[in-house]
């Protein structure tokens, strides 16, 4: 009877010793071990990655919270304004600070401390080793001079263009159909330009904008190509090839000033102005944060000064608004304005590394295509609606001529 009970129990769930040995032998076969090993490894790798991501996220968010809510307000303001410079990170400060606090920090950054100096005194103080010498343009290539610059927190690039009539606004489309903007490599082909920098502002929610339309009034070759009536800083050239930087600008005023080419950027980006024999530097009275920057200026002799700085890297954190003004002063600009920055900051110069004897092996993939600055975004250079382009020296269809014909 006991034996019968044992047999019954075995069939109801108990495994005999012989059966256990068979099962163990099956599990120890090479194929079974391989399947178990691969599954275990994949699971552990996945678990480790999730854990690492969570740890890094918590650490970063905690550090950001402490920094933004700590006792050091200058550091807080710098971090907030640096994040606000790029559309892709504008939402970050709102995670840790009240909206009115963020708005107040941004508003404070627009407070201007003007420095007024006579034009003669300014010209004497701003001359550097190159400017003002008779042979400055002796070794110029394409009627331009490319130079590297650096500051305490940034590396940058200066492109001097001797003839201001060659500088014009290139547009990605006629802005009537909402087409995506163009990358800088495409705009120079479309406009047959030898050089270019990014231009004005455009809608960029969350850093995902397509660059389809500009923001603020925009002129190209003597014609108003966009006018949404938004009040912005205006940066452009009149038909006498003089740089005009002012805010705000409307179509009626632009036409009365004979504007031929120009774009708009956020309010508060007038850098240097000159009138009545004086030059005024519009320094920021408070912290403006560091970022990639693009700006355009002009000397009294008409020379146009393009500036682009690198940013968001260990070797170049970025430049402040005041840094950009100081560079402009060094190069003798009597008028200057800031253009769109962050991941939009771009400078192109056709075959510059060949013309200036730069080792091509030191360049990244975009620089080998003609990009002068180092692009730090995670994608290809952005699609943008407007650019300041430089016509080729030998072209007869100059920007000034195009403006006169319009």
What is each residue range found by the language model?
Residues 208-229, 280-334, 344-406:
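Conserved, well-ordered active-site substructure
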Residues 3-4, 8, 12-227:
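Zymogen propeptides
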Residues 178-182, 254-260, 315-322:
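A short, polar/proline- and glycine-enriched secondary-structure boundary/capping micro-motif
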Residues 194-198, 234-236, 244, 295-297, ...:
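Structural recognition of the beta-strand scaffold that forms the well-ordered cores
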Residues 173-177, 250-253, 309-313:
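Short, solvent-exposed aromatic-acidic interface loops
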Residues 161-165, 236-242, 274-276, 298-303, ...:
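Short acidic-glycine loop/turn motifs at beta-strand connectors
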Residues 154-156, 190-192, 230-232, 291-293, ...:
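Extracytoplasmic
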Residues 202-285:
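Active-site-adjacent helix-turn-beta-strand microarchitecture at beta-sheet edges
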